């Protein structure tokens, strides 16, 4: 069983991520993880923090000479700003009082759309600092690091590869008639400031981001993650909590600021008649079973069906807005303007990288549940045996 967990605060000493249950023999390096984290910092409209946020990574456990050992893999991502926050975020009690100013000033004006107010109520804080430190999207760096480990496992054991791109940002839609990106388009997507292959839409999106920045506002959008090479039969229909589409939806909704998910054509399917909503089954020129379309997004009955898996997520505009919204100061009970933490005009392109990491982790878990194996070689043999058990025309 594959499990993962993250720990750490936005301005704490480090983020820590751990993944347990990974087979032995997965090739992984510190450089792989550093490169993945660099992709998370890309994207037009990112804030000032991205200019100096450098991710110093250490593989602490579970890897020897570039290969996983089958034991838990732990990763540390150091915070390069830690010296500025040593006292404010100290784990140990201080032997002196800190002035309630500067970085230690109480954050008593919760931001609408953030975890601030409800987190303060839930955990009994009179200051939003403890809430925003953990609820911050900085935590997603941990998940991107774990997602890189999952990427290597999926590719080496199953030949599964993924790619993510932006399909809408700030109300600007990319052209739906363009071919879907493939993993071979990764370099071109990384080169795009808004992670799209649609150059016309790219220019209009950049213009919208510039407008939002001038207006001290923020923008949301829609991302899509595609998974290629996923064999049929991952996930199951027998219990609702083991359905692959349910797990993918949960993984995307667990990313900060995401408010909607669809698999395949998703909500469009609700407006179509049944005769136009499903993917007809045919025998292709090679004598094998095939489909005429992929409206289901590669998942039917909670199981992968062998087609490309398509998952979309809708991200709301970042609620840390320079043009601060109305709130209430919880210390005085009076109306006030919300605190304005350093933020981005949009983080949709970067969020696509996070979403891709979560899809990878979910697919890795469900693929391992299906095929098992204590080593990559054993997992690969199990996959080959499974595929060989099908009649020739069903492969």
Swiss-Prot record:
Example GO molecular function: FMN binding
GO CC terms in record: cytosol
Annotated binding of FMN, by residue: 134-136, 256-257, 301, 316-320, 342
Single biological process term from Gene Ontology: amino acid biosynthetic process
Family under the similarity heading: Belongs to the chorismate synthase family.
PANTHER family assigned: CHORISMATE SYNTHASE
UniProt name for this protein: Chorismate synthase
Organism of this sequence: Bifidobacterium longum (strain NCC 2705)
Gene: aroC
